[in-house]
């Protein structure tokens, strides 16, 4: 994986905006199509750690998989949440820009510029 990459969903307007901002800045990065490529558990844990967030904070609560898996339940462990994120990657908030030891959620998209 490149030193810098964007977790990207081309159907998401915020993700497309973040991609455009990074390209405009001539940032050297790779696009990671996280909905199409298999996420490895250790890799996802590393990204969550770089974000300085808990897995729960990174959940998209409006997704059907959130409701279907009762993720509102505060008794669900972080490990279980990570496993569900791997199984249902739409649960992961996006876009996420990772550069070296830093990562940031691109909400708003301009956030990605904070770590370039």
Residue positions per predicted region:
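Thiol/selenol-based redox catalytic cores and closely related redox-interacting motifs
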Residues: 36-115
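Local sequence-structure signature of Cys/Sec-based thiol-disulfide redox active-site neighborhoods
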Residues: 1-21, 29-32
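Alpha-helix C-terminal capping segments
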Residues: 22, 115-116
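Short glycine-rich hinge loops at helix-strand junctions in the catalytic core
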Residues: 26
């Amino acid at each position: 994986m490149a030193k810098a990459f964007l977790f990207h969903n081309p159907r998401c307007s915020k993700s497309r905006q973040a991609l455009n901002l990074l390209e405009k800045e001539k940032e050297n990065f790779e696009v990671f199509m996280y909905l199409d490529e298999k996420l490895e558990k250790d890799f996802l844990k590393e990204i969550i750690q770089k974000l300085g967030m808990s897995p729960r904070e990174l959940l998209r609560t409006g997704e059907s998989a959130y409701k279907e898996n009762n993720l509102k339940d505060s008794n669900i462990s972080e490990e279980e949440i990570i496993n569900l994120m791997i199984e249902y990657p739409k649960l992961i908030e996006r876009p996420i820009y990772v550069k070296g030891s830093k990562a940031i959620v691109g909400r708003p998209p301009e956030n990605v510029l904070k770590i370039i």
